[in-house]
A protein has these predicted regions:
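Cysteine-centered catalytic environments shared across enzyme families
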Residues: 1-250
Length: 250
C-alpha cells in the first residue's frame, strides 16, 4: 500500500467481496464522506475524482459516488456518459460477470491495469510496476472498457463522448458561457478555494469569473517575474481577497 496510500489521507478501506480484494484510499472532496468500495445489488464501485452533476443524476445522492451506481443500474454502461466530471471509474458487475473501466473525456485522473491471471487495477503507476513488472496498460482518454470477469477478454469498447468537430460558431458567446459554467461547477461545496493568480490570461480569466459570480476565494500572487501593473489592477478589483507573497532572490 505504500505506493498509493498517500493519494487518500481521509480513509483507508479494504474489503474482500466475491474473492476480489478491493482497497481504496479516500480523499474526501464532494458531498458526505462515503467509504469505498460502494457495493449495491452485487455491483462494486470504486472511483477517483469528482462528479459535478451528481445531484442532477441522483437527487438523493449523499456523495458523488452514489450517482455512478444509480446511473449504471438505470441505463447500463452507456449511462456513464451522463456523468460530468473528472474521474476514473471501476465497476465490478458480478450479475453480468463484467469489469467496467472508464476514463473521463480528457483522462484527467490516472489509472493503470493488468487483467491477466490476476486482476490488478491501480491509480498509481508505481504500484503496477512493483506488482506486475511493467506488464500493465494505462486507460486512454475518452474511453469505456468492458471486460469479461472470468476470461479477462475485452467485450466492448466505447467512447465516453462523441465530438462534433464541424465549425458552426460565428462568435465567442457560447465559449464564454461554457467557460464560466466550467469554472463555477468546480467551485468547492464546503471550502473557500485558494487561487494562484499570475498576471497572465489563464488565472486572470478564472479570477474574473469567480469575482463576477461573487464566489468567495483567496487569490495569491507571487510578484516575481510578473507584470506588476496588471497585478495591482487586479488587486483594486479583488481588494482584500487578493494577497501578495514576496520571495527573496534565493
Amino acid at each position: 500500500y505504500k505506493f498509493i496510500e498517500k493519494r487518500g489521507p481521509d480513509n483507508t478501506n479494504e474489503v474482500r467481496y466475491n474473492d476480489i480484494n478491493f482497497v481504496h484510499f479516500l480523499l474526501h472532496l464532494t458531498g458526505e464522506k462515503r467509504i469505498q468500495p460502494i457495493i449495491d445489488n452485487n455491483i462494486a464501485c470504486i472511483f477517483n475524482g469528482e462528479i459535478y452533476n451528481y445531484k442532477e443524476i441522483f437527487a438523493e445522492a449523499k456523495s458523488d459516488v452514489d450517482s455512478i451506481l444509480h446511473i449504471y443500474k438505470e441505463k447500463g454502461v452507456k449511462g456513464l456518459r451522463d456523468l460530468d466530471g473528472e474521474f476514473v471509474i471501476v465497476l465490478f458487475d458480478f450479475n453480468r460477470n463484467e469489469i467496467i473501466i472508464s476514463s473521463d473525456i480528457f483522462h484527467t485522473k490516472p489509472l493503470f491495469y493488468n487483467l491477466n491471471e490476476n486482476i490488478v487495477i491501480s491509480s498509481y503507476e508505481s504500484a503496477c510496476q512493483i506488482i506486475k513488472k511493467n506488464t500493465y496498460t494505462s486507460i486512454n482518454p475518452n474511453e469505456i472498457l468492458v471486460f469479461n470477469l472470468f476470461t479477462r477478454e475485452l467485450k466492448n469498447k466505447l467512447v465516453f463522448h462523441e465530438f462534433d468537430l464541424e465549425q458552426k460558431k460565428k462568435n465567442y458567446d457560447d465559449y464564454i458561457t461554457a467557460f464560466e459554467k466550467a469554472v463555477i461547477k468546480r467551485y468547492p461545496e464546503y471550502n473557500k478555494p485558494l487561487v494562484t493568480l499570475s498576471s497572465g490570461l489563464d488565472s486572470g480569466a478564472i479570477a474574473c469569473c469567480l469575482n463576477k459570480f461573487n464566489k468567495s476565494s483567496l487569490f495569491v500572487s507571487i510578484p516575481k517575474n510578473e507584470n506588476m501593473q496588471t497585478l495591482k489592477s487586479r488587486k483594486v478589483i479583488l481588494k482584500d481577497n487578493h494577497k501578495f507573497i514576496n520571495l527573496s532572490n534565493e
